[in-house]
Curated annotation (Swiss-Prot):
It comes from Anopheles gambiae. Its EC number is 3.6.4.12. Gene3D superfamilies: 1.20.58.870, 2.20.28.10, mini-chromosome maintenance (MCM) complex, chain A, domain 1 (3.30.1640.10), Nucleic acid-binding proteins (2.40.50.140), P-loop containing nucleotide triphosphate hydrolases (3.40.50.300). The gene is Mcm6. Component of the Mcm2-7 complex. The complex forms a toroidal hexameric ring with the proposed subunit order Mcm2-Mcm6-Mcm4-Mcm7-Mcm3-Mcm5 (By simililarity). The heterodimers of Mcm4/Mcm6 and Mcm3/Mcm5 interact with Mcm2 and Mcm7. Residues 659-679 have a biased composition (Acidic residues). This is DNA replication licensing factor Mcm6. A zinc finger (C4-type) spans 152-179.
Length: 814
């Protein structure tokens, strides 16, 4: 609507629809009541302040008051917006001492329908709509001429309140009836009205983006109090209208200037007349769509992510936002005794095994508690996880599932990402040529998760760029005269391949991956996945993959739906557990163990243990407490955090030990070291009876977890070394302990746990298998086969009485 075109002399065209809406809206402001009082009377008093000029109105109130008025505002918003602002000005002036020269504006919130950026089309121009998107670029604030006062240079007539149509607009004609001037006007700056103006660019969010499509973006124009209220990387709801503005940037392309210059290079044609105006580089004025916003609100989806300020959210607020069925489900999940296991099964149903990795990622989703010290130093609460492993160990699958599951997650590849693409870039605006900041992946994932695949393929100078973001959670920029510190409160989930494609167990973690020590120390958890040839594991993985391809619905073992898990994580994140004194003492003790192991000559740590690992333990303990909706961090939470941290730092991820597979290797090794073959070994009645009893027990598969196997082997080794020390101190003429004595000692240690003869026989077979594995596979125990004078081969009946000693170079690992 160009109001200036309507002026002929002193006449103005009367818009009946606008005037009618102005009266109805003024009646709404004066009559709408809530709790017996006029709702907008109190907020009007704030508009007297010089820095306030906008009245915020809930669109739901307008719908409840007059449906016809609400429909007119929706359909003809841009047309009647000046009349609505005039209603606000009249309403304020009637009740306060507002200056006549001050303009007031209206902004609507709670508009029911939300549109995506991709859905914007010319049919929505001029209507009131609400769009949502992620801010990727913010421009500096500029003054905008809204109502200009001009002076006619022919008759000196003053022409007031000439509306500007998104570009500098002169009056169409002088308002003096006797003056026909249409071109010669001068702007009176001191009598014109300027307001603050800021342009931002929003982009489709990752969740709304169709697969394989480039994200769409749109320019959003902010005015008055709305300037400087948005930050790059955050998601907002913008309420306003779609407008068409001149594409000034297209007029400034270099082609026109070059063509004009070529026409005037030769001076001999200077006296010629002007011909061929189109060849002078004149361009048609193009237009583009933009969004004129009247209100800005942070996107606060019900349970879609962490967009709500977590410092303001309480359990009661979140309970009020749930339906009774949703709240009952959250309460039921919080009381689940197997919640830890059920959550990881529901979160990664299509990935077999790797439970420790799943637990680490689950705790990363809950996060720790961010804290601020008295010196205003921020201690991060986000947990960073790195997965290192051989090809085809589901590293990228973990990242893709997390990026699809988390509502505010950004997935990127390390090789295809630069330092500016990860942090922030300083680019030049195509219209004003000012330098502006464009958000990178870490800023776009603010309050979310940034998944970086092929992390080891990044260039070293690009890895250095995220040092600050990983620990201080800020990004500092000093480029092209722009100095800024931006938020990057994100958790980083990275995946990397070892050097050479395969993990070398003989080397430490730092020797296996191309990451610097500063980067490695900033990760809270490192998980190492090794692709080992194991018949049982390979069969289970193959069965899982075939099931997924054949009947996907039936192969997923999900206890809770993804919506239930997301709702529960959102609810649990608002807890801020406090560390109890007992847990505090255990944290210090565990940290001391890690440091001692690191400084010792026999240390097995993958890198230096620093205070950052202590902070990692604290964050993991807080995440465990959050998962259980607990207000306190107890010793149990600290033990699980220490176990996870210890597992990721100290040793490679190990599969279960299948003792049945060692029988063949044992027989081969017996022949290799010169023992008698089973056919040559004399058989006694006692051994025949044992052979008859053993198969019935041994038919059961013997499988131990790696931790159980190590605990059992350490128990045997420590006892054998104690016996060796005792024999040496007593000067006994004997070396080592027999296998029978070792088995009997172990059975005496666990006799309290045995309730039947069958359990005793099972435990006996188990310890025999463990000892055989320690002898023939791990070579931790050495059998002594030294024959003495007077002994024959028949005296060595079987290997039960073989003397066993511990390898002198073996070191017990805790």
């Amino acid at each position: 609507m160009d109001v200036a075109d309507a002026h002929v002399g002193q006449l103005r065209v009367r818009d009946e629809v606008g005037v009618r809406c102005q009266k109805l809206f003024l009646d709404f402001l004066e009559e709408f009541k809530e709790d017996g009082e006029i709702k907008y009377l109190k907020t009007v008093e704030n508009l007297v302040n010089p820095d306030r000029s906008t009245l915020e109105v809930s669109f739901e109130d307008v719908e409840n008051y007059n449906q016809t008025l609400a429909t007119a505002i929706i359909e003809e918003y841009y047309r009647i917006f000046p009349y609505l602002c005039q209603s606000v000005s009249n309403f304020v002036r009637d009740r306060t001492s507002l200056k006549k020269s001050k303009e007031c504006y209206v902004s609507f919130v709670d508009v029911p329908t939300r549109h995506k950026v991709r859905e914007l089309s010319t049919s929505k121009i001029g209507t009131l709509i609400r769009i949502s998107g992620q801010v990727v670029r913010t421009h500096p604030v500029h003054p905008e001429l809204v109502l200009g006062t001009f002076v006619c240079l022919d008759c000196q007539t003053e022409i007031r309140d000439v509306e500007q149509q998104f570009k500098f607009t002169n009056p169409t004609i002088c308002r003096n009836p006797v003056c026909a001037n249409r071109r010669r006007f001068m702007l009176e700056v001191d009598k014109s009205l300027f307001i603050d103006f800021q342009k931002v660019r929003i982009q489709e969010t990752q969740a709304e983006l169709p697969r394989g499509c480039i994200p769409r973006s749109v320019e959003v124009i902010l005015r008055a109090e709305m300037v400087e209220t948005v930050q790059a990387g955050d998601r907002y709801d913008f309420t306003g209208t779609l407008i068409v503005i001149p594409d000034v940037g297209a007029l400034q392309l270099p082609g026109a200037k070059a063509e004009i210059g070529s026409r005037h290079k030769q001076g001999d044609n200077a006296a010629e007349g002007v011909r061929g105006l189109k060849a002078l580089g004149m361009r048609d004025l193009n237009y583009k769509m933009a969004f004129l916003a009247c209100s800005v609100q942070v996107t606060s989806s019900r349970f879609g992510g962490t967009d709500m300020p977590m410092s303001e959210v309480t359990s009661q607020i979140m309970k009020d936002q749930m339906t009774p069925a949703e709240w009952n489900k959250v309460y039921e999940m919080s009381r689940d005794p197997r919640l830890y296991q059920n959550l990881i099964n529901s979160l990664f149903p299509s990935i077999y095994g790797n439970d420790e990795v799943k637990r680490g990622i689950l705790l990363m989703l809950f996060g720790g508690v961010a804290k601020t010290t008295q010196e205003k130093t921020t201690l991060r609460g986000d947990i960073n996880v790195c997965i290192v492993g051989d090809p085809s160990t589901a590293k990228s699958q973990f990242l893709k599932q997390v990026s699809d599951f988390s509502p505010r997650a950004v997935y990127t590849s390390g090789k295809a990402s630069s330092a500016a693409g990860l942090t922030a870039a300083v680019v030049r605006d195509e219209e004003s040529f000012d330098f502006v900041i464009e958000a990178g992946a870490l800023m776009l994932a603010d309050n979310g998760i940034c998944c970086i695949d092929e992390f080891d393929k990044m260039d070293p100078h690009d890895q250095v760029a995220i040092h600050e973001a990983m620990e201080q959670q800020t990004i500092s920029i000093a480029k092209a005269g722009v100095r800024a510190t931006l938020n990057a409160r994100t958790s980083i989930l990275a995946a990397a391949n070892p050097i050479g494609g395969r993990y070398d167990r003989s080397k430490s973690l730092q020797q296996n991956i191309q990451l610097t020590a500063p980067i490695m120390s900033r990760f809270d958890l490192f998980f190492i996945l090794v692709d080992e040839c194991n018949e049982v594991v390979d069969y289970a993985i193959a069965r899982k993959i075939v099931d997924l391809h054949s009947h996907i619905e039936h192969s997923l073992d999900q206890v809770y739906s993804r919506e239930d898990v997301l709702r529960y994580i959102m609810f649990a994140r608002q807890f801020k557990p406090v560390i109890q004194p007992e847990a505090m003492a255990l944290l210090v003790e565990n940290y001391g163990h890690l440091r001692q192991r690191d400084t010792g000559t026999t240390g097995k740590s993958t890198w230096r243990i620093t205070v950052r690992q202590l902070e990692s333990m604290i964050r993991l303990s807080e995440a465990m407490a959050k998962m259980e909706c607990s207000e306190e961090v107890t010793e149990r939470h600290v033990k699980e955090a220490y176990r996870l941290l210890n597992k990721s730092i100290i040793r490679v991820e190990q599969p279960d030990i299948h003792l049945d597979e060692e029988e063949g290797e044992e027989n081969e090794n017996v022949m290799d070291i010169g023992e008698e073959t089973p056919e040559d070994t004399p058989r006694t009645n006692e051994t025949e009876e044992n052979d008859q009893d053993t198969p019935a027990v041994a038919k059961k598969k013997l499988t131990l977890s790696f931790e159980e196997y190590k605990n059992l082997s350490n128990m045997l080794v420590i006892h054998m070394r104690n016996e060796e020390s005792r024999m040496e101190s007593e000067e006994l003429d004997r070396e080592g302990i027999s296998k029978t004595e070792l088995i009997n000692w172990y059975l005496s240690q666990v006799e309290d746990q045995l309730e039947s003869v069958e359990e005793l026989m099972e435990r006996k077979v188990l310890i025999e298998k463990v000892i055989d594995r320690l002898i023939y596979h791990d070579q931790v125990i050495i059998p002594l086969k030294q024959a003495k004078l007077g002994e024959t081969d028949q005296d060595d009946a079987g290997d039960q009485d073989v003397l066993l000693v511990v390898h002198p170079n073996y070191i017990v690992e805790s």
